[in-house]
Amino acid sequence: MNVQFPWLTVLTLLPLVAAFFIPVLPDREGKTVRWYALAIALLEFGLSAMVFWRHYDAQSAQFQMVETVPWLPQIGLNWSLAVDGLAVPLILLTGLVNTLAIFAAWQVKQKPRLFYFLMLALYSAQIGVFAAQDLILFFLIWELELVPVYLLISIWGGAQRQYAATKFILYTAVGSLFILIAGLGMAFYGGDFSLNMAALGLKNYPLALELLAYAGFLIAFGVKLPIFPLHTWLPDAHGEASAPVSMVLAGVLLKMGGYGLIRFNLQMLPDAHIYFAPVLIALGVVNIIYGALTAFGQENLKRRLAYSSISHMGFVLLGIGALNGIGLNGAMLQMLSHGLIAAVLFFLAGVTYDRTHTLAMEKMSGIAQSMPKTFALFTASSMASLALPGMSGFVSELTVFLGLTNSDAYSTTFKVGVIFLAAVGVIITPVYLLSMVRRVFTGKQAGDMFDKLLLDINPRETFIALSLLVPIIAVGMYPKVATQTYDVTTTAIARHVHGALPAVAQHHLPLYAQLTQSAPRLFRETTVADNSL
C-alpha cells in the first residue's frame, strides 16, 4: 500500500529534528528540556500508532507505505523506507520504551540538554533501522545509533563508564563492518548493481557467496543480539549505564540484532539459512544455559539482569532456527515480550538504586519493609521474566518450543535433545530470579541500609512500571494483541525459507538424511524429479 504523505520519513526524522531545538529552549535546572523531550516522545509514539492504525494492513506480507527518493544517485543510494509485519511491532515497541525511558530520566541534573538531545537522536536512529530499505541507508543509521549510546554510557554511567562505553563501541562498530562488507558483496554480484534490500533478496547467488554473506551478517547481528561469545560488552554496558539507558538498551537495541537476523539472514539468504539453522539452534541453547548459569553467580543486580537478557534472547535464536512459521512467530513474540520485561526490570533496578545508592544485592537486603510497592512490582516483573503462565514470557517461550516440536526440518532425536537442553535453562531461570528477589527485598536486613528511611516508589515511577506491566499481562492473556500485527509476514517468510529445503537436501542427501525428519519425503521428491529428466 503506497501512501502519498511521507509518514515514515516524518516518523524517522521527527525526534532528531526536534532535538536540534533543545539548545534554544529556556532552561531552569532542565525542567523545560525534560518536558519538551517527553512531549516529542509522546507525539512520536502517538503518531506512530495513528499512522499504522490507518495505513498498515496486517493481512499483507508485502512492504507497505513505501517511500523512495534519490539521495546520491551517482552511487545508487536512495532514501528508501518501508514497513511490514517485522518492522511495525518493533517500531511501536521502540516508541513505548523510549517514551517511558525519557519519563524515567526525570532526575537528570548533569548536562540535561545534551542528555535529552541524545535520547531523541537515539529514538530516531532506532526507527530508521526498522524502516530502512536501502543497504547503505540501513548501515549509516545503524552506525549513527552507536554514537548516542556511547555518549549516554560514558557521560552518565557509573564508575567504570569509560571502559564499558569503549567496549560497547569497539564490539558494535567492528561488528557493523560485516554488514557493509557482506551487503556490498551481494550488491556487486551480477550485472545489476542495487542497494535496495528487497532487490538483493531476489538475486540468485553462488552458494559460497551466500554462505559468506550469511556468516558476515551473523557476526554483525550476533554482537547486537547478543550471541555467545560476542556478548561480553553487554554486562559491562548494563552494569554502568543509567536505568533509562538500560531500558532502551535491553528493550530495543538488542531487538535490532534479532530483526537483522530475520530481515537479512532469513529473508535475503534462505538457502544459506538452511545450512546455518542448526548452528543458530545450537547457539541459542548455549545462550539459554550459559546466560542462566552466569546470571546466578552475579552479585550486581543489573549484571544479573544483563545475563538474564542473554539467556532469554537465546529463545529468539531457537525460533529463527526452527524453519517454520510457528517458530518464527515465537521469535518475534519473544523479542516483543523481552523488550517489555527487560525494560521494566531495569527501570525498577534503577528505582532501588536511586534509594539505596548501590547495586550490590547483599547491601540492599531486606528493603521490602521500607519499599513494599516496589517489592510488589519487582516481583510481578520477575514472574513475567521466568515465564509465569498468564504473562507474555510464558506465551513466547511456549510458542518457540511448539515451533521446534512441529518442525519437519529436524529429526525427532535432535528436537528432543534441543528441547531438553533449553528446558534446563528454563528451570534455572526461576532459581536465579527468585533468589534475586529474595536477596534484594526479603533477605536479612542490612544494618547500614536501615539507618535511614527509604522512600517507596512514587506515582510517576509507578505509572512507568505499570505502563510496561499492563501490556505484558495483556499479551500473556491474549497473545493475538501482538501476533496479529506480524503473523502473516512471519508465515510468508518461513514459507519462503522452507522452500529452499528440497534443494539443499538434494545436494546433501547423506548428511541431510541423518539429521532431518523430512529427509525421506524429500528424498522421494528429488528421486522422482531426477528420474523424470
From Swiss-Prot:
The chain crosses the membrane at residues 5-25, 33-53, 86-106, 114-134, 135-155, 168-188, 208-228, 242-262, 276-296, 310-330, 331-351, 384-404, 416-436, 462-482. Keywords: Membrane, NAD, NADP, Plastoquinone, Quinone, Thylakoid, Translocase, Transmembrane, Transmembrane helix. It catalyses: a plastoquinone + NADH + (n+1) H(+)(in) = a plastoquinol + NAD(+) + n H(+)(out); a plastoquinone + NADPH + (n+1) H(+)(in) = a plastoquinol + NADP(+) + n H(+)(out). GO terms for cellular component: plasma membrane-derived thylakoid membrane. One of its GO terms (biological process) is electron transport coupled proton transport. It is found in: Cellular thylakoid membrane. The keyword Phosphoprotein does not apply. Its main location: membrane. Pfam families: Proton_antipo_M (PF00361). GO terms for molecular function: NADH dehydrogenase (ubiquinone) activity; ubiquinone binding. Its EC number is 7.1.1.-. The keyword NADP applies. This is NAD(P)H-quinone oxidoreductase chain 4 2. The lineage of its organism: Bacteria, Bacillati, Cyanobacteriota, Cyanophyceae, Acaryochloridales.
